[in-house]
Amino acid sequence: MTDVLARIPYARFLGLRTQMEADEMTVIMPFQDKLIGNPLLPALHGGSTAAMLELTAVARVALSFPRLRLPKPINVSVAYLRSGRPRDVHAQARIGKAGRRVAHVTVEAWQEDRANPIATLSAHFLIAEDA
Amino acid sequence: MIDPRLQEILPQLASAAAHTHALGFQLEGVEGRRVRMRVPYREDLVGDPETGVLAGGLVTALLDHVGGMAVWVAMNRFATVATLDLRVDYMRAAEPRKDLLAEAECFRLTRSVAFVRAWAFDETTADPVAAAQAAYMLDSDGGRGPGANLKGEES
């Protein structure tokens, strides 16, 4: 399998890594100082977390629907559940429904404890080649 | 009228955190309650190498940040704020090799929550790349203070 995220400049900027275990894909964002948005707490920038969630969704859709073009986001909705600590972030995506043109994806991100996610994303992507 | 103490730190609030600095965020200006920011185009911020279009995640990061700036302007002071949720509609791809701009306005401020709308564009707000609706929690550090996220236990 070719790693989609390795081809995306913004995913490289964030330092994202993909881990495959059977059919389960986990994306990891190793902690770097440049991901920090609040230096006092310190906490990850909401934009770091959101972008990582969205790229996890892109990678998941591209894995299930391999085609020439990358899936294009129509909209994304992010809920921030906990402040992101200066640690690695893990994320897994699930495709809830994929029709002819649109796929709906949910992604959950966590740090040490999978049971306590730091953020979730719900998104629609255009997957039709000619859309 | 913006409090001069807030006015003075607005450029830093726009671009001085590690993430906003790494992305190259810049404050363009404030007009009434509306804040405008810019991120200069860079190859390493691209989301699709085939087209050279900036990443959706970058658009989201800029909208999240300019929204927070609009909250500080509406509060007329600096406070710890945290995004509660953020929804972004991507209306069209950003033009390759063009800077990305964004504007935000906080249209309702309650004791705990700020409601914000924001737009991203490359030429004019009339032709947006994306639109966002977001809510922010105010004074969100809950008195935990500096270094709270470095403590071992889950808070």
Each model region followed by its residue ranges:
Chain B
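Active-site helix/loop of acyl-thioester processing domains in fatty-acid/polyketide metabolism
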Residues: 54-77
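Hydrophobic beta-strand-centered segment that forms part of the acyl-chain substrate-binding groove
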Residues: 70-101, 106
